[in-house]
Amino acid sequence: MSLQPLLVFDFDGVILDGMDEYWSSSRKACLSLLRGVFLPEQTPSRFRQLRPWVHHGWEMVLIAAFLQESDGPLQRLGVDAFAADYDQQLRAGLDRFGWKPSLLQDSLERVRRQAVSGDRAGWVALHRPFKGVQERLAGLEEEGVAWSVLTTKGRDFTDELLDAFQLRPVRLDGRESGPKPEVLLRLRREWALKGFVEDRRATLEVVLETPGLEGLKCFLADWGYLRPADREGLPEGLDLLSTSKFAAPLAIWP
């Protein structure tokens, strides 16, 4: 095991805010699959509202497809009722459009590859680091703590963005590395894990229940893409990490 402690961070919604890129790429991927439909270039408010429910990138392409409908379930139910039955709505949407997650994920990544190769600067400009995050990550080294990234985003795209914003984690695990609890188990065998910072509560709850990850400190990033009730009734072992606590020395984190 490495003598150096390691703090693990999710990427989207924790380090970087890429909301406009999520929409831009999801919109283009959807339009490549549904010819002749209209989707606005500006990020719709309903897309922003549903983003906290998204686990994998392909879901955003399907949400774009829901948004182009004039009388679909999202229009009939409204965002709140749709989100309350989110997983079932995804399954029904895949059936209705005749799609598979792999098709949507491939379409999304193709759009992103084209954007990176054709206009990298424009693609990067659709992202921004959350306020204070770059400085705090740089400060971890002074505390003797390394940091890594664990994300469901493709590794290559994440690496492009880390490079663009001059962020240098000691390790990067993208969606290709497998489910987050499995990656954390591997990391725990190699490092002295200090904690995992994530903005998806459901992921953190799975981590807490994973055998072999007992005692791992889990932090819910208060500045991320949180659902309305995510901050309420947090289970033991899961702490809400505010921006002020995040900026403070690790020794006084919750």
Residue ranges with predicted function:
Residues V14-D159, A164:
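Alpha-helical substrate-recognition element adjacent to the catalytic core
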Residues Q134-E141, L184-L185, L204, L208, ...:
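Short amphipathic alpha-helical segments and helix-helix/interface helices
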Residues S177-L185, R227-P235, L250-W253:
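Short, charged, surface-exposed secondary-structure boundary motifs
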